[in-house]
A protein has these predicted regions:
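Generic low-complexity segments that are intrinsically disordered, proline-rich and/or Lys/Arg-biased
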Residues: 4-5, 40, 75, 118
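N-terminal helical capping/dimerization or prosegment-like subdomains
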Residues: 13-97, 102-106
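Active-site metal-coordination/substrate-binding segment of hydrolases
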Residues: 93-151
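Short, Lys/Arg-enriched N-terminal segments with co-localized hydrophobic residues
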Residues: 4-15
Length: 151
């Protein structure tokens, strides 16, 4: 068994998709961890430059930067949200939604600190890993896969 990321288990196999995942899994986990290390608990502010607080702005910038590093076109919409676009050869559009804010960490973290993600027994654990930073990153990597395959 390989590493479990947000309910998906990457295994070595013959399929091209599994080979691609196996090749990029460490990078994907690194990027999920990078985003999950940001304590992006949403707070309301009067500052229009960071309407949900500095940490949420940092998470937005980190997500957009990751999209840009993958060759996509990121857009920041007045620090409220962002979009990461890729214009392929087709007129077909695919969209996915995610968020990078988290609820407060709370108590009871026994295996790690909430904003210091770790892999334990093949499972990535940390605040926001499954809701929703890991899911967002998994979708972004799926889009990267499609782009690299020439779709």
């Amino acid at each position: 068994m390989g590493l479990q990321v947000d309910g998906f288990i990457a295994r070595k196999g013959k399929a091209m998709e599994n080979e691609w995942i196996e090749k990029h899994i460490d990078e994907m986990v690194r990027d999920i961890c990078k985003l999950s290390e940001i304590p992006s608990v949403s707070v309301k502010t009067e500052n229009p430059d960071m309407p949900f607080g500095q940490a949420c702005l940092d998470a937005l910038h980190a997500a957009l930067d990751l999209g840009k590093s993958m060759g996509f076109e990121p857009f920041n919409h007045e620090n409220y949200c962002g979009t990461i676009l890729w214009k392929g050869e087709s007129d077909t559009e695919i969209g996915f939604f995610g968020h990078a804010d988290v609820v407060p960490a709370g108590n009871g973290w026994t295996c790690c600190q909430p904003f210091e993600p770790v892999v334990k027994d093949g499972i990535l654990i940390g605040r926001g890993v499954s809701d929703n930073k890991g899911s967002f990153m998994t979708a972004l990597y799926a889009l990267r896969y499609l782009k690299e395959q020439g779709y």
